[in-house]
Amino acid sequence: MTAILERRESENLWGRFCNWITSTENRLYIGWFGVLMIPTLLTATSVFIIAFIAAPPVDIDGIREPVSGSLLYGNNIISGAIIPTSAAIGLHFYPIWEAASVDEWLYNGGPYELIVLHFLLGVACYMGREWELSFRLGMRPWIAVAYSAPVAAATAVFLIYPIGQGSFSDGMPLGISGTFNFMIVFQAEHNILMHPFHMLGVAGVFGGSLFSAMHGSLVTSSLIRETTENESANEGYRFGQEEETYNIVAAHGYFGRLIFQYASFNNSRSLHFFLAAWPVVGIWFTALGISTMAFNLNGFNFNQSVVDSQGRVINTWADIINRANLGMEVMHERNAHNFPLDLAAVEAPSING
């Protein structure tokens, strides 16, 4: 009898815990994905803050030339970063207990791998939590689908690219200047600006900004007057009101006359789907492009391939980009390479005349 009562009490305790985890009445929804999301994101955030402030220099290239990234070692907010794990570690799983000492772990950039892996788990769980809350509330699942775009982008630069290149040292540093360095080196080695998927991503981000500004300005310009001149227009809306707060017919008419009739949406639902889908699809393509370039399927390189009928080279901007790529490749990791890979692969010119 005692055993049965204890089992019921434990079942009741577990049941109450399950109900609390999945309750939509909590001020912040936790969910089963949140059970994993909370500790992983807290770990990533805590280690990031500590390492950004106080981590010692890291031997990123594996050539015994440590690079400083923290504030206490001479950096500021702009130049500081979490330096990627050393090339000497490569793709090895490198938790603290795999190092001979904490000093060795810090020298080899262990915090970067710890932060990145916890962060990727955390944001993936955040996406799952979005779906979970939508499911509990009877909503459609597109919020999580939209969030999959930045998750895919982060996964591409922090995980897929290092896997393709063979080392976490090739991952994106966690800092402002480090991000710019990553972008420049990526262009030098993969010609990303000439990759169609990156072009689609640019169209997605810039187009999304344009469409967002157009939509916001159109709605704001066609509000239904509910206030006097002496009141803020925002006072004319009450949260939860059933009637429309702006005149979509007026907005449609304005935009249709500004450009042409069929450039303007006459359906609010299809309009908002378009506003969500455009940048999401663009960022999906960019993440896919990074993931293919990770394995050296690079952007277009015309390499003086535009010629006239006599076979003479017609110089184009693409050739200027190639020249810039070589310059950037020469300058990065100066002490790790004698020659940039593109130049080293070419036969030495004859000097015998």
From Swiss-Prot:
One of its GO terms (cellular component) is photosystem II. Tyr-161 forms a radical intermediate that is referred to as redox-active TyrZ, YZ or Y-Z. Chlorophyll a ChlzD1 binds at H118. The record marks A344, A345 as: Cleavage. Residues 345-353 form a propeptide. Photosystem II (PSII) is a light-driven water:plastoquinone oxidoreductase that uses light energy to abstract electrons from H(2)O, generating O(2) and a proton gradient subsequently used for ATP formation. It consists of a core antenna complex that captures photons, and an electron transfer chain that converts photonic excitation into a charge separation. The D1/D2 (PsbA/PsbD) reaction center heterodimer binds P680, the primary electron donor of PSII as well as several subsequent electron acceptors. This is Photosystem II protein D1. It comes from Lotus japonicus (Lotus corniculatus var. japonicus).
